[in-house]
Amino acid sequence: MTRIQTVLGSITPNLLGRTLTHEHVALDFEHFYKPPPADFENELQQKISMATLGYVRLYPYSSRENVRFYDEEALEASRKDVLLYKKHGGGAIVENSSYGLKRNLEFIVDLAKTTGVHFIAGTGHYIHATQDATHTNLTVEQMTDLYTRDILTGIDVKGRTVKCGFIGEVASVYPVQEFERHALLAAGEIQEVLGCGVSLHPHRVSKAPFEIMRLYLEAGGHANKCVMSHLDRTIFDMDELLEFAKLGCYLQYDLFGTECSYYQLNSTVDMISDGQRIENLIKLINEGLVDRLLMSHDIHTKHRLTSYGGHGYHHIHMNILPRMFQRGVTLEQVEQMTVTNPANWLSFNA
């Protein structure tokens, strides 16, 4: 019988509930800091406040405070929003912080114990540039051993053994670097053996998802247990997205709540709005792909938490799903995307 491995132990899939499949509750995103425009340097160097929030929303990666998503203030703000998520019907959060993002398993375990939300932690490697010297020279075999150990044996967290429940997020740039290729191959090899879920993070060009899926599949990974993240900032052309969908993985729109068209990490494109995300999901539903769709926010900076003027982890449930119902999406289809699909993806013989 398949089960889902949470940080507090394995559960049956029917207990998971409504699930956010790509979030962070604590991580270090300082690698992506970008110097602010000279005209706004003073505002972006200050603490986040009502006076500076407008600048931070437009240039989120130019505020050092904003990308320090790991200090005590951030943890308390994150805890507050997880409680709001639980209050408004949330059941589970898939925490995608992998090696290179300084995941905080102690905090994740504490959140799971104190909020009642199921947390599923990931193993895997983020992009090469975020890794420290203990990881940069790992071979495919060494990565395979590490990921397998994290899932089957577990990690000691203050005397508690915590097992990871999926591989992810496994991230890469474009073209894929050798270290990142190793991580993708390791993910595919382990997935074939264990049957666990995998979450991939593509670079910000439309060719990237195709390339990393090819590597993952060639290593033996199963498409129906793999999530392609961040498609709402990667593949904008619907025909190209439908072509990608033929590969058989889950298609994830995970930047809900990001309503600024200026995308600082790739200023050559315009970030789509929540309205466009809804429109695209409806198109994919009409193409018969509802059983392959996932939704989330990918919160990874402070300004997206309610304590800093943001939308929090409950945004999809409180603001997006009602709009989807208004546009003809059925309760059955919403349950498929937010409950059934996450459970199917995360279930394996744990």
UniProtKB/Swiss-Prot annotation:
Its EC number is 3.1.-.-. It comes from the Eukaryota. Binds 2 divalent metal cations per subunit. PROSITE patterns: PHOSPHOTRIESTERASE_1, PHOSPHOTRIESTERASE_2. One of its GO terms (molecular function) is hydrolase activity, acting on ester bonds. Keywords: Hydrolase, Metal-binding. GO terms for biological process: catabolic process. The keyword Cell wall biogenesis/degradation does not apply. Belongs to the metallo-dependent hydrolases superfamily. Phosphotriesterase family. The keyword Methyltransferase does not apply. Its cofactor is a divalent metal cation. A divalent metal cation 2 binds at E169, H201, H230. Disulfide bonds: none annotated. It is an enzyme of class 3 (hydrolase). This is Phosphotriesterase-related protein. A divalent metal cation 1 binds at H22, H24, E169, D298.
